[in-house]
């Protein structure tokens, strides 16, 4: 059994680690709440643009924006959003597994894939698989700006316009709640039809007067909508990261507490054994006299 002094040193070391994990848990909780506020603020903007696009696209007779046109799919571009830092449980691993499974399914249909990567964890992971990476970005921090994301996103959209790829998807961790984050792979381009599109079509029997003309408006709105979808996905992923880190650090703090209790028991037993040995030596010495 280790000596009492050695055990006491271990207890102090674990207590120091526990303070760090507790602080990280509190920081992650604060950041998660701020990110949730950004999520709530950006969703109405995205939903409103989606509804306007639906209406304008129906009014723009004779014109179909390339982002609305379905075509035979031979190659798909995936924008994968991961984290820059670790210590967030299996968040990235689950996302990578989901993405690789989807790529495998497409491969079985003779569909190849190109990647655009946001986040250093995804960059280091997918590089090892030898994928064709069309663009990458890292170091966004906890408050990503749309201007920073446009470069990688436009690389994928330009490839779609030029016919290099036939669809663009986005893979990220969707924030469900504090305890649940769901990895998803969803289609961006061609823009999938929303359930609300049919509802709006039934409800609205009137039309707008468009200024400028519907074509110009539609071109602009589609770009804004896709940018908002990417921003929303990145913010969702940041919220998921902070929630996963908060849970992981809480588990680490609790485990440290349990370990400290176990070490204290061992320390008390070692101290008791030491005292017993000293008493036995005293008794033996007295008996010898």
UniProtKB/Swiss-Prot annotation:
PROSITE patterns the record matches: ATPASE_GAMMA
GO cellular component: plasma membrane; proton-transporting ATP synthase complex
GO MF term list: ATP binding; proton-transporting ATP synthase activity, rotational mechanism
Transmembrane segments: none
Record's keyword terms, sorted: ATP synthesis, Cell inner membrane, Cell membrane, CF(1), Hydrogen ion transport, Ion transport, Membrane, Transport
Main subcellular location of this protein, as a coarse class: membrane
Domain of life: Bacteria
InterPro entries attached to this UniProt entry: ATP_synth_F1_ATPase_gsu (IPR035968), ATP_synth_F1_gsu (IPR000131), ATP_synth_F1_gsu_CS (IPR023632)
Pfam families, per the entry: ATP-synt
Topology relative to the membrane: Peripheral membrane protein
One GO term (biological process): proton motive force-driven plasma membrane ATP synthesis
Record localization: Cell inner membrane
Keyword Transport: yes
Subunit record text: F-type ATPases have 2 components, CF(1) - the catalytic core - and CF(0) - the membrane proton channel. CF(1) has five subunits: alpha(3), beta(3), gamma(1), delta(1), epsilon(1). CF(0) has three main subunits: a, b and c.
Its job: Produces ATP from ADP in the presence of a proton gradient across the membrane. The gamma chain is believed to be important in regulating ATPase activity and the flow of protons through the CF(0) complex.
Family: Belongs to the ATPase gamma chain family.
Record-given protein name: ATP synthase gamma chain
Organism per entry: Haemophilus influenzae (strain ATCC 51907 / DSM 11121 / KW20 / Rd)
Gene designation per UniProt: atpG
């Amino acid at each position: 059994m280790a000596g009492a002094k050695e055990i006491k040193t271990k207890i102090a070391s674990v207590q120091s680690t526990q303070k760090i994990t507790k602080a990280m848990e509190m920081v992650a909780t604060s950041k998660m709440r701020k990110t949730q506020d950004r999520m709530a603020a950006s969703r109405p903007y995205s939903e409103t643009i989606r509804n306007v696009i639906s209406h304008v696209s129906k009014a723009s007779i004779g014109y179909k924006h390339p982002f609305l046109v379905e075509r035979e799919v031979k190659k798909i571009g995936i924008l994968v959003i991961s984290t820059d830092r670790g210590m967030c449980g299996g968040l990235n691993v689950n996302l990578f597994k989901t993405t690789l499974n989807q790529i495998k399914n497409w491969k079985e249909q003779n569909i190849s894939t190109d990647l655009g990567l946001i986040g250093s964890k995804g960059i280091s992971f997918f590089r090892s698989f030898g994928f064709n990476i069309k663009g990458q970005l890292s170091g966004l921090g906890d408050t990503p700006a749309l201007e920073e994301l446009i470069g990688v996103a436009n690389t994928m959209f330009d490839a779609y316009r030029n016919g290099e790829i036939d669809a663009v998807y986005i893979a990220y961790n969707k924030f469900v709640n504090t305890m649940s984050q769901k990895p998803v792979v969803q289609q961006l381009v061609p823009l999938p039809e929303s359930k609300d599109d049919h509802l709006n079509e039934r409800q609205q029997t009137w039309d707008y007067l468009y200024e400028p003309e519907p074509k110009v408006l539609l071109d602009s709105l589609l770009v804004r909508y896709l940018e908002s979808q990417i921003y929303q996905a990145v913010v969702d992923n940041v919220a998921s990261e902070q929630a996963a880190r908060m849970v992981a650090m809480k588990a680490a703090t609790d485990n440290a507490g349990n370990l400290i209790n176990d070490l204290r028991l061992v320390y008390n037993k070692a101290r008791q054994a030491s005292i017993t040995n000293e008493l036995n030596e005293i008794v033996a010495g007295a008996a010898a006299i």
